[in-house]
From Swiss-Prot:
Plays an essential role in cytoplasmic secondary envelopment during viral egress. Interacts with the capsid via the large tegument protein/LTP and participates in its transport to the host trans-Golgi network (TGN) where secondary envelopment occurs. Modulates tegumentation and capsid accumulation at the viral assembly complex. The lineage of its organism: Viruses, Duplodnaviria, Heunggongvirae, Peploviricota, Herviviricetes. InterPro entries: Herpes_U30, HSV_ITP. The gene is UL47. Residues 474-983 are annotated as: Interaction with large tegument protein. It is found in: Virion tegument; Host cytoplasm; Host nucleus; Host Golgi apparatus, Host trans-Golgi network. One of its GO terms (biological process) is virion assembly. This is Inner tegument protein. It holds the Pfam family Herpes_U30. Keywords: Host cytoplasm, Host Golgi apparatus, Host nucleus, Virion, Virion tegument. Interacts (via C-terminus) with the large tegument protein/LTP (via N-terminus).
Amino acid sequence: MMARRTVDFKKLIEQLRARATDKAEALNTVSQLEIGAVDAQDVTASAVRAFVGALPSSGYHFGFVRQNVVFYLLSHATVQTARDPLYAAEQLHEQLDRFLRHQHDGGGDEDRLPFYHNGATLTAFQKLLQTLREIQTVIAEQSGGTAAAADLIASNNASTERRGKKGGSSSGGQQPLVRRVITQLETAATEARPYVNCRAVAELLDLTYQRLIYWACTLMPYVLFRRDTDTELDTVLLMHFFYTHYRSVNGDLAVEFQNYVKNSVRHMSSFVSSDIDGDQKPGAEHMRDVSYKLFVGNLQARDASGLMFPIISTRISTVNLYLSPERMFFHPGLISRLLSEEVSPRANLDAYARVCDRVLEDHLHTPRRVQRLLDLTQMVMRLVELGFNHDTCAAYAQMALIQPASQKSSLFVSEIREKLIQIIYNFYTFFMCLYVYSPTFLFDHRRRLILEQHRSTLIGSKEELQHVWSNVTLNVNTHFAVQYTEEDFEAHTKGATEAEREYLYRDLHSKWGVHLFTLRPSRGAAGAASPLPPLDGVTRSDILRECALVNLNEGRVNYASLLAFSHHPEFPSIFAQLVVVTEFSEIFGIPQGLFQAVGSPRLFALIQLCRVLLPEQVTLYQNLVSIYNLTTFVKHIDAAVFKTVRDCVFDIATTLEHLSGVPVTPNVDLLAELMARSVAHNLYTTVNPLIEDVMRSSAGSLRNYLRHTRLCFGLARGRARLSEDGVTVYVEVQGQYGLRVPTTRFVEQLRELVRRDRLLAENLRGLNERLLSVRVRVRQISSDTEEVSRHAKGHRTVAQMSKALKKTASKIKVLETRVTLALEQAQRSNGAVVTAVQRALAVFDVLSRENLERRGAQLCLTEATSLLHRHRALAPMTWPAGTGVAAAAEADRALREFLEAPWESAPQPPRLRMTPDTDHEESTAGATSVPEVLGARYEPAHLAASDLLNWYIVPVSQAQQDILSSIDPPAGSTSVSLPPASP
């Protein structure tokens, strides 16, 4: 359970009163507030008076706190714990104002510290609160669609014609209002710049910026982005995109979409696939939702039926015809194909390559430094026009993540894939940062965590993508250039003493971290940094003796005796070696279960020691504070948090080696436990989604392929015989089932079997690659633990975690191998069956009407006979010995369903009776000279075999004449009975 970040203000005041005469203890007490925070709801006017009265009158920065208590409390108060942070801030202002009204001197020196004295700080805080309240009221009213909101829109955009009321596509009229509110907020942030590092001010700005950004980014009406040149496919994809992601301002699209589909349904059939396995083609899983809505003509429909329906095609040749290239990012199926490189080498990708080049050039290769929030919102609109928002970028990033690092594709296809990854990763991190952006130190921490965490997730150990992440980092730091400069600090602290500057800088450093400038002494500053006793006859032995007595087991800092030695030239080295290194090692050897109760207080005491006795080691202090905050107040230890703690630990070890002059090996007990939590969190948040994606993307294909394999096995076990008249196929399944199937239908289904085998093999090609991506991700997680492992050889927890990760990777590898072998075996056996089927179909193809007409009966019959002879020469197909009865029964059942289901009521080919009228109709109807082999045929007369023998005996000349003439008797004549044949 994580500790409460805020301190008990009343309890802290009581501690100050009890230790008022001990300045060191007073510093320890207020440090709790400065490292943690005070809940703004606990601050009352009486509590502030008690706090000021309990502080020592001199020493350290106590004088600054007493004279500028309003600034001090705003700097260390938090409003995040309140249900309504802005209301809590307003109540805080009221209490501080009440406190000042009862102060006799008003506090502070207006001439010496014009920004930080109580009056100026409270006035600026009040003005900021008023502005933030106005802005949040506008946002709430706009989101709620109240009458006041309508009035505001009308006043800001009276000339704008809107297409509808709330829920319609009318937010284009709100853009002027958005720009006005953004300008108002940026002006307020600029005016509050001297106080932007006060925690309460930073949290309020942070909250308002995020609400404003979210509101502005939801106002994306379809009418602002559609074009007259959009194709039918463009229009369908755009309507679905804007209705799905921006429904609040595109409510009328539901009706518009329904009418559009109804009027354009004939044109839309060209870019959908009606194949039975259309939803299993590469990239098709990402088109299922929009395809279903197109199929039913309703944007509000949800696919819960489980039925099959036409899927919008992801085939490059089809997409090229019906999708505008600049709309490519609205088609997730296309992006999935390009990322997976499921592209024919002959596919025309030039248009998509040009779009990628243009996006990279316009947005990423030469980024412009963003100075205003308005610039960011304008960039969002440009990205939405391309088809990007937070959700689509997250989906595309996941697509890229599950793809292997390298594939055997053409160089051009691989280049497009790399460009897509660069675009996707850049815009994904852009939106991740955008929705948590504010010009404060709070965002600076988030930005670093986002970059660190997503570098581990998206790039990992893929060396070929390291340059992509360098570009991502450059663009994020350019688009979100948030910092507090040395010029700002000098302007705001003009007139402060050196002790006050040191306190203010240390406070800044604890909030901004290593990105902050280095403090230089001010020429005009007065006063010492801390009250040091005189140094009289202090020796190295004295320092050694005092340092040896330091014990932080009780979590309290008693450094009064050491303070006299702290400016001795040898003190930093001795103190670091005897105290800091020892405490540092012992603290990080405390188990995580005891760390909150034992380790955290000792770490806090060590922080205080370093702050007072090693004031120049600001980086050491900052790293200790970072570890304290992350291990004490952060609930979820993800990869970014673990890496931050790990880096801080090793940075501290390096600093202590430099100070003490002796090698420092950090204790990794706590790091090992944090690593275990980080790995578990990482597996849950990054590997599990990959496995779920594998199951979701491949489960359907695997089920279909299993049914297909059973069917092929059933065909191998069965025997088929063609009837004498060629109309019917008789099928025996191991002599148990007798099936009678029309030949035409039988041939059609065999062709479907061959086609499905090809499609299923194509769909399963990416399964092994997805399994490989899971194994690669586990390997990346393992690499995150390597640095700790190098310093903890033989450590039990580290060894167990490494063993578990290796075991996980090994199991995934075994699964990958088993799946690969099973698929290869199935493909070989299925391939043998399909090859046999193709040989049989080849005979029917050779004897097709088109072939007979083009090549003649003699050549076709000769070729068909040759095919039959070659086929009969092959060994009969067998199945593995020991095949289970259940498996054989399932295969036989699959074959029976395959043959019976479509044809139980199928019509037989028509029969023609051999009559004079029939022959006359055939000869005069202009029919083709060659009939279909499997088409309508004559039905012979039902005569005994003896009646059919010797019925036509004539001289050769007569036979030739009869063959060349019609067998129809002349009209009006009667049939002539033939004389019986002579023996």
